[in-house]
Amino acid sequence: MELFMTIFLLVLFCFMSYLCKMYLQMRDQCCYMLAYECYKPGEDRKLGTDTCAKVLMRNKNLGLPEYKFLLRTMANSGIGEETYGPTNVIAGREASPNLADALSEVDDIMFNTLDKLFARTGVSPSEIDILVVNVSLFSPAPSLTARIINRYKMRDNIKAVNLAGEGCSASMVAIDLVQQMFKTYKNAYAIVVSTESIGPNWYNGQDKSMMLSNLLFRSGGCSTLLTNKAALSHQALMKLNCSVRTHIGSDDEAYGCCIQIEDKRGYPGFLLTRKLPKSGAKAFILNLQVLLPKVLPLRELLQSVIKASLSKKKTKSSALEAMAAGLNLKSGIEHFCIHPGGKAVIDELGKSLGLSEYDVEPSRMALHRFGNTSSGGLWYTLGYMEAKKRLKKGDRIFMISLGAGFMCNNCVWEVTRDLEDPNVWKDCLENYPVKSTLNPFMDKYSWINDESIDINSIDQEWLENKLGFQFDPEIIERIRS
């Protein structure tokens, strides 16, 4: 009997030790967000209506049909007049960018946000264990991570990763990478820098599918400080509950729907095809099939399955709408942080997921105020939620991002304390939400679509009065031709 009891106690001790070890490992693998800083350029970088018009007029490959297309697209883009452009574009050098322009653009974003991040948190650059930088369209040597390490004199054993080519979803790729690295490196600090190089990649041709990137993409970025130190959990803004990555690059159609190429005349740019919505929906559905069971209550999932099996009614809804039908996403999610990639993307995701205008407001306003800042866009959306004091302790935030490849990378954060920092929205928060996201382009330049105007009678004085600024006389010849 004593031998049996001894064996039993020994087994029990081993089992309890195992459980304790597993608990400590899981605790150390948590990913906490301590702070984030979004980039805000100076007033001289704003792309107002007139500045945008000047940039468009400088493109010698555009004629009247292209101007009409750009006017219509810009007016309905959901982008306002307060967005920011790269310095070389503002200065009129978009057709001949150089390496110095590219480095200056990303340096300003990276160092500006990192300086503020270190100052806010009190964390020293020498304490950083992991550094991940994601810039899709610019990859110099030495790498951008090396530039940061050199600037801040970081440790020689820092784990540095430079991500390129991941598109608008790159920030979520970086966050997921850090979470995986936290499983190996204990009590670590990690920084993720998410931005894009816009200036050197400005399209100067006339392909409409490639001109879209000029209308949508703007300067911006964000630096985020993360840790797996359990002792700092009380200081965290939020905790990462789960992250799911989906890549459908094996599908040729999906691979080519969002791609960097040269047009027929040799002008480099970023092509967005009509297959993009279909590929995005496919990747998103596959992602949700893995993610939703992780975040929604079992009761909600069972009810959805029962409703789907009992329903025999056929509808014309999209595959995404059909999947979300019957699911109450708000049973496991309070906030929806949709990447502000474009008005159509926000509209479609909001409709398919059954979201209200309140739910999609942060993404709409981020797009209106800052434009599509690529991988940094999600953080401007998150900043809006925080500035509007929406985020309360225990709330869960669903971050949704789509990127070239084609891929969908989503995650769910849990807010660990009430958040109300006005952050990058401080100077303009009282103006939002705006009543209308229509761009004033149509009001000022609607005459371009006026069929009653005799194109051949247009002269320089008449056109300058319409535009409100002087221009190259050859623009008149391009319009007439």
Residue ranges and their predicted role:
Residues 1-28:
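Terminal signal-anchor or tail-anchor transmembrane helices
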Residues 380-400, 405-430:
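Catalytic phosphate/nucleotide-handling subdomain of diverse soluble enzymes
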Residues 128-136, 162, 336-337, 399:
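Short glycine-rich or small-residue beta-strand-to-loop segments that form or flank ligand, phosphate
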Residues 45-46, 142-146, 173-176, 201-207, ...:
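Short acidic, glycine/serine/threonine-rich loops at helix termini
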Residues 34-35, 134, 164, 191-196, ...:
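Short beta-strand segments
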Residues 77, 81-84, 104, 135-189, ...:
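Conserved catalytic cysteine-centered active-site region
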Residues 1-8, 122-125, 392:
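Membrane-lumen (extracellular) interface motif
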Residues 27-54, 58, 62-77, 81-88, ...:
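Hydrophobic pocket-lining "lid/loop/helix" segments that shape and contact the acyl-thioester
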